[in-house]
């Protein structure tokens, strides 16, 4: 009994220690690797993951409900200042988080299930996936594609549905992970594991196992060889991929793009040097063989030339392809940043208008409106610069890109006009802000945009193209309550509405929230017709009112190039008139600049009567020249008089004193009896 009690006393602590050792890893495994994550829920304060593995509420009241990707990236950097946050990615599943606080701060008692965002620290590394038995691993990766997390999740599901297991079972996605990032929360591919819905029948496997042993051995050998080759390829691909594709540094995007181009050119130069070195070795071999076997040497030379040309052409094609990939990624990142800036500027402008209702603040509204105009104009300038670059680099791609340029330039002006139209709900604010904003818009465009209407630039072909001239010409019908002016000939050529709709659908990526605001405004309904601009004369009837000029009706008279063209244009204009009768016509207050030529004619954009300005400048030109000549004559006469006076003053003789002031002083002292002590000293010595 004593021995038994002693054994029990020794075994109990051992069992307790064993249970604790087995249980402690399970409990601490949750916090074994810290993952920086942030979570958002509108109406509540943001939360972020601490290093202990618990969710913490943000202390700031205004840090709430972020939806833009750039805002989320900035918040990640703010929540984790010690980390190098370079990108974000949605978490793979929703997480239930408790203790959500209202924006006011308390109480903190709500629980929500949200999908947090993983803040990528440093270089992006894809998650390692486990492949269970009877499951298959696969991946989809293309540098030409750049899509978000949800797209690659759906793509993984589609790929697994097309696969079959060994037992001819349908397969589903077990796990997946996105691959290399190409932009903010955008990725180039996905890797996934597909598993069968049901486990395979073990009895069937045992029956066929003995018959298929030999085949399995061969398949295993083949799979080993294939895996070795694929491993070699996988090892080569990351080394050849430029770091620019892996990490997106939004603050230094332009510098990173230039460095990536330099690295790409350096790699291409090294490859060409290597080929030239091989060519030199082959040339030496050819010369040696030519002395021994001339026919064989000529055959070898022809093969060598063909191989060399093929190698050089493949290197050039690879270099062009890599350059296009880098430019495409750069364009996408820049456009994403521009869209994010426009979105932020629109949000600030609307918030300033909402604040102005309770607390008038004209300065804040004006500053936010200027910031929005700057964001739109930067997008416009970027579009023009990209088109100019494509004209120099690839004319075919530039021709394909031209409709997008037309669409973007048109909608940039429409969005800015729609933003200005939001001021109509505040008459006092509109009277103060609108003239300043319109003047600032014109001055800023004059400053940042090239003078395309005068300058002989690369955009000249697109300016003189008829299709490009259609981008901002609007024919807006007046309400039925106004007096109808006398109609003139209207041979305008009207584009079908289906074309404009398809154009909008093709470029939804560049749409902004301002378009939706304009469309949703109840007292604004307009019929827009895009008209060819080759006018002989344009007559505009303007109804004068107290607040703003209102465009009543415009009639355009175009040149007659062809009889067929005239007939088609007249029929199209008649059909449009019939449609206008069936549509309820409402008044639309628009800027006078809309009825002027397109936005790229920047001098005429914001001037209602450019003829007056031109006539005024021609009248004052002689006066300016006469005043300049008069001032020049006065300057010449004054210079001549001054020069004559100087010459007159220089005439005569000037007495020159050969003695220095010291010598004159010593001579004066000697006259008064002064003797040099040095001389007297030497006289006494002698």
Swiss-Prot record:
All residue ranges annotated as the E2 domain in the record: 240-440
Chain positions of motif YENPXY motif: 674-679
SS bonds (residue pairs): 42-65, 76-119, 101-108, 135-195, 146-182, 160-194
Membrane-spanning intervals of the chain: 622-642
Signal sequence annotation: 1-21
Residue segments, region Disordered: 201-245, 479-526, 550-585
InterPro entries linked: Amyloid_Cu-bd_sf (IPR036669), Amyloid_glyco (IPR008155), Amyloid_glyco_Cu-bd (IPR011178), Amyloid_glyco_E2_domain (IPR024329), Amyloid_glyco_extra (IPR008154), Amyloid_glyco_heparin-bd (IPR015849), Amyloid_glyco_heparin-bd_sf (IPR036454), Amyloid_glyco_intracell_CS (IPR019745)
Post-translational modification: Extracellular region is proteolytically cleaved.
Residues annotated as domain E1: 32-197
UniProt region (CuBD subdomain), positions on chain: 133-197
Outcome, altering residue 348 to C: Results in destabilized protein structure
Glycosylated residues in this chain: 84, 201, 249, 417
Record has Transmembrane helix as a keyword: yes
Name by which UniProt lists this protein: Amyloid-beta-like protein
Native source species: Caenorhabditis elegans
Lineage: Eukaryota, Metazoa, Ecdysozoa, Nematoda, Chromadorea
